[in-house]
Amino acid sequence: MLMKFDPSIFRAYDVRGIYGKTIDEEIMKKIGNAFGQLADTAEMPEASGCVVGWDVRGSSAPLAEAFVEGLTYSGHNALIIGQTPLAATVFAGWKRKFNSAYITASHLTKEWNGIKFFDENGVGFMQEENFKIRDIVGKNIYDKKSGGNTKNISNKDIITEYIEHVLSRVKPRNKLKIIIDCGNGAAGSLAPELFKKAGFEVDDIFTEPDGDFPNRLPDPAEDDLTELKKRVKNSYMGIAYDGDGDRLVAMDEKGRKLTPEQISYIILSELLKKEKGIVVANVECTKMIDDIAKKFSRKVERIPVGHTYMMQAVHEEKAAFGVERSGHYSIPLLVPFDDSIAISFYAACVLSKSSKRLSEIVDEMPAYPFIRLNFECDDREKFKIVERIKQKLKNEKSQNFKINDMDGVRADFENGWILIRASNTGPSIRLTIEAESEEKLGKLKKEFSEMLEEEIRKM
C-alpha cells in the first residue's frame, strides 16, 4: 500500500518525517523528482548536478537511493558520495558548483529521517523553495526524461579534500588536548582526523557510526554529555557534535558548556583582526556579540531566527562571520557555508595561541543577566498575540526603546532588551530578556510577562 503524502513533513528549512509512517522510499523518490523539476526553472540557480550524501541512520542509504532515482528520472545528474558529515557533502557541492542534497534528521531521534537542500554556494534552501518542492510532490507530477546519470565518488576522497582545504586556511600554534564526542553520528568520519592531522592531541569517543545512537542522543544536550564531562577535566576543552555534524557543543575543562555567543567571542577576537566585513547575528543573540564587534568597529546586522537566514545574509553582505543562537555559525574564510566542524577547529586554533585555560578565558568575557521564558497559548492565536504586543509597543507615547520587528518584536532599551516571538514548532510564545543588571532584568521580566499573560487571557 502506497504511503499517503503528508505535506507537513516539509518544514521551513528542511524535510522531516518518521520513517515508515510519514516518509519512505516512494515519497523520497517523488521529492527527488520534484527537486529536479524545480532545478529546470529559472527560480533555482543553475548547477551542473546534485551531490547526494547521507548520515548514519539505518534508513538514510535506502532513502538516498530513492531520491537519486527520482532525480535522475527528471533528467538531472547525481554525484553520490555516501555517508559523510553534512559539511563534507555541502563542501563537495560548493567545490564542483553543484547543488547538494543530504539525507538526515539532524539531531532528532533515530526513528526520524528527512532531507536538506543547498545551492551551489552552500546556502540552505529557504521556505519558499522547499514549499515549491512540496507543492510539486503534492500535485503528484512525476517527470520522466532521459539523460540523468549517476556517478559515485569516494567519501574518503572528499574528506581528504575537505581536510586539506581547511588546513590551508588555519593551523594551531600549540597542540592542545581536546576531547571529541561524535555521538556515533556522521562527524566521526571527519572531525577527529582533522584535529589529529593539525597536531592536536585528540581523545575521541563514540566515533563508530551507529544509527541507533547507543551512547547518547543525536542532540548533544548538556545533560546527555556525561562521558565528555568526565574526560574533559583532564584536557583543555571538549567538543560534541549532533547527528549530522552541523551543530556543536563546546565545553571548558570544568565541564561548563559554552554559549554560542562565548564561542563567537573567542572566534571574533582573532578573526576580526584580519577579515573585513560585518557580523551577522540573529535577534536572539546576546549583547556579547555587539561588545566584541564594537572592539573592532564592526557593525552587527540582526536577522530573523533560522540558520538559512544567517547563511543568506552572510553570503549577500559578504560578512566576516555569522552566528545563530541555536548553534549554527559561518566563517567564509574557511568555507562559505554553515559548518560546525570547521568552526570548532577554528576556535581551537585561536585558543591554541593563549597561555590561559579555557575556563579563565570564559570568565573574563563580558556577561549579562539573561533569561528565556515560554508561555503556552493557542497555536492558532500565537502570531496574533505577538502582533498585538508589537502594535502596543509602537503606540507607546513615552517610547524609550528602539523596536525591531523582523521576527516577532524586539525592544532595545538603554540597558537591556526583550524579544517576544511565537514558536515555529509548538503552541507557545517565547520571551527572551537580557539586561545589564539583575534589577533591570527583574523589572523587564515583570513588565513583559504581565503584558504577555494579559494578551493570552484575551484569546
Language model features: what each stretch is:
Residues 1-69, 73-74, 152-178:
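An N-terminal, well-structured beta->alpha segment
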Residues 37, 49-112, 193-251:
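N-terminal small/polar loop signature for handling phosphorylated ligands or for N-terminal nucleophile
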Residues 100-112, 232-252, 256-257, 300-302, ...:
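Glycine-rich phosphate-binding loop
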Residues 113-233:
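Gly/Ser/Thr-enriched, mixed-charge loops and adjacent short helices
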Residues 275-459:
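Phosphate-binding and adjacent anionic-ligand microenvironments
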